[in-house]
């Protein structure tokens, strides 16, 4: 805190104490009265007005023009206009043109505390300041923007910059973009169509395999046949489906190995959910081969051990259903759904909690009213009825017969409608946000041509340094420009407050 009055024995003050203060904030010039500033001596301008020397005053501003007696501040001019209103009324209002964090930084710089905020703006400011900074407010029903997140684009550019020092980096980068971005080029679109076709063919083959006329023998029977030394032809699958399965596995293995070899970062490759889905889609096939080899080596094993290995083989085959998740790489909706579930764990938890409470309450009521009827003999048995009723599925396998049971069922159904509808609305809004955001990002990539996109990626190494130097030069030259061209010397053009 700078002393408000000069010390004893000092010479003539460097400026009259009651002289108006001439300030220039980001090109906005104002003349402030000493009496208005004296009302708030703890603020930066109040301390500047009471400065005992020019040296103390220079510590409080960015620059000082001794000839014009003008103090320069390289700060936001819009906030300065709100600051003038504060010196007139004693209340500070939040500006919509500034985010809450930038507003807080400006307020701290000028020496204003939270008590200076007007009552109409204080609650909104504190609520937004406590919230964690996110790309968008997760607690808000209306997303603020659907523009692509700059952080996501920066992460992609940072990863692609690794190709600059790699061997055959330009070729690897082009192949990587072809495999990862369906809208990057015509070959990438063809590759995406082939990949989708292989995934659909694999799923269709798995479904056809379950039909009786195409279904292979049960795994346990096949193991027993091999153990008995009978022909292996008796236990093989349909040859057409088997060849189709081999082709799909070969394609999936090619995709995984190619992405692994072309990936800019191996560590980030194994952390990406879509890459893990690709690995899981081919892993059951190779595990089945290992299990088959183990079965071949255990011809003398007991029937129980062979039956257990046969069940393991069945589990591995069942894991092929995860191949349908590979479509998420080529579907904007599936990727948006995954992002929605990732950012909606609170709402999903609340939904499950509401359902659990409702099922427990209404199951107890139904057990009391329908204890003698079949299906309601225990409270855990009533949980199935409560879950089906609250989710409004209504299989009808268990039906209450008494008046009390029917009333409980009515309350359970109505409560389920309300309980499920509330969190679902929030989840749907988030899905809409992520979907529009993903579509906007894809549109931004498609709008730029392939050559422009390549030039952008090839220059990503020098973008940061050039931007940094440019911003420094601009910040250093901007203030002199304001002082020389935008700051007239005539006091008559300054506004007095």
Curated annotation (Swiss-Prot):
Residues 209-239, 292-309, 368-379, 400-406 are extracellular. The keyword Acetylation does not apply. A motif (Selectivity filter) lies at residues 392-397. Residues 380-391, 392-399 dip into the membrane without crossing it. GO terms for molecular function: potassium channel regulator activity; voltage-gated potassium channel activity. It is a multi-pass membrane protein. Its main location: membrane. Residues 470-482 have a biased composition (Basic and acidic residues). InterPro entries: BTB/POZ_dom, Ion_trans_dom, K_chnl_volt-dep_Kv, K_chnl_volt-dep_Kv5/Kv9, SKP1/BTB/POZ_sf, T1-type_BTB, VG_K_chnl, Volt_channel_dom_sf. The keyword Lipid metabolism does not apply. Potassium channel regulatory subunit that modulate the delayed rectifier voltage-gated potassium channel activity of KCNB1 and KCNB2 by altering their kinetics, expression levels, and shifting the half-inactivation potential to more polarized values. While it does not form functional channels on its own, it can form functional heterotetrameric channels with KCNB1 and KCNB2. Each regulatory subunit has unique regulatory properties that can lead to extensive inhibition, significant changes in kinetics, and/or substantial shifts in the voltage dependencies of the inactivation process. The transmembrane segment S4 functions as a voltage-sensor and is characterized by a series of positively charged amino acids at every third position. Channel opening and closing is effected by a conformation change that affects the position and orientation of the voltage-sensor paddle formed by S3 and S4 within the membrane. A transmembrane electric field that is positive inside would push the positively charged S4 segment outwards, thereby opening the pore, while a field that is negative inside would pull the S4 segment inwards and close the pore. Heterotetramer with KCNB1 and KCNB2. Does not form homomultimers. This is Delayed-rectifier potassium channel regulatory subunit KCNS1.
């Amino acid at each position: 805190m700078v002393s408000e009055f000069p010390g004893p024995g000092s010479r003539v003050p460097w400026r009259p104490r009651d002289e108006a203060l001439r300030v220039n904030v980001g090109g906005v010039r104002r003349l402030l009265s000493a009496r208005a500033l004296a009302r708030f001596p703890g603020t930066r301008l109040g301390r500047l007005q009471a400065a005992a020397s020019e040296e103390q005053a220079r510590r409080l501003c960015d620059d000082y023009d001794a000839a014009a007696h003008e103090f320069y501040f390289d700060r936001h001019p819009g906030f300065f206009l709100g600051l003038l209103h504060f010196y007139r009324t004693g209340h500070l209002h939040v500006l919509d043109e500034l985010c809450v964090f930038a507003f807080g930084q400006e307020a701290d710089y000028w020496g204003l505390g939270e008590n200076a905020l007007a009552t109409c703006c204080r609650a909104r400011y504190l609520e937004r300041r406590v919230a964690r900074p996110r790309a968008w407010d997760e607690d808000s029903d209306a997303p603020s923007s659907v523009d692509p997140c700059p952080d996501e684009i920066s992460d992609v550019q940072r990863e692609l910059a690794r190709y600059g020092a790699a061997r055959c980096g330009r070729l690897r980068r082009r192949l990587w973009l072809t495999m990862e971005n369906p809208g990057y080029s015509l070959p990438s679109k063809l590759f995406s169509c082939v990949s989708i076709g292989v995934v659909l063919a694999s799923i269709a083959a798995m479904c056809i395999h379950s039909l009786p006329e195409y279904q292979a023998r049960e795994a346990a029977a096949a193991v027993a046949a091999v153990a008995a030394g009978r022909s292996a032809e008796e236990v093989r699958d349909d040859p057409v489906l088997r060849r189709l399965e081999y082709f799909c596995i070969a394609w999936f293995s090619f995709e995984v190995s190619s992405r692994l070899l072309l990936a800019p970062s191996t560590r980030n490759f194994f952390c990406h959910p879509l890459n893990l889905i690709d690995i899981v889609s081919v892993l059951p096939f190779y595990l089945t081969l290992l299990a088959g080899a183990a079965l071949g080596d255990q011809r003398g094993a007991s029937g129980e051990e062979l039956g257990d290995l046969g069940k393991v083989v069945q589990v591995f085959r069942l894991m092929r259903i995860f191949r349908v998740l590979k479509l998420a790489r080529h579907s904007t909706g599936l990727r948006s759904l995954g992002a929605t579930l990732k950012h909606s764990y609170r709402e999903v938890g609340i939904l499950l909690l509401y359902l659990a409470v409702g099922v427990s309450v209404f199951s107890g009521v139904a057990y009391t009213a329908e204890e003698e009827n079949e299906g309601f003999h225990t409270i855990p048995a009533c949980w199935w009825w409560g879950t089906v009723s609250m989710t409004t599925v209504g299989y009808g396998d268990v039906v209450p017969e008494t008046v009390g049971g029917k009333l409980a069922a009515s309350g359970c159904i109505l409560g389920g409608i309300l309980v499920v509808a509330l969190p679902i609305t929030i989840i749907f809004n988030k899905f809409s946000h992520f979907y529009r955001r993903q579509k906007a990002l894809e549109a931004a990539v498609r709008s730029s041509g392939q050559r422009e996109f390549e030039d952008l990626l090839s220059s990503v190494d020098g973008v940061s340094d050039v931007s940094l130097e440019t911003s420094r030069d601009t910040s250093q030259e901007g203030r002199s420009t304001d002082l020389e061209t935008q700051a007239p010397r005539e006091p008559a053009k300054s506004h007095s407050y």
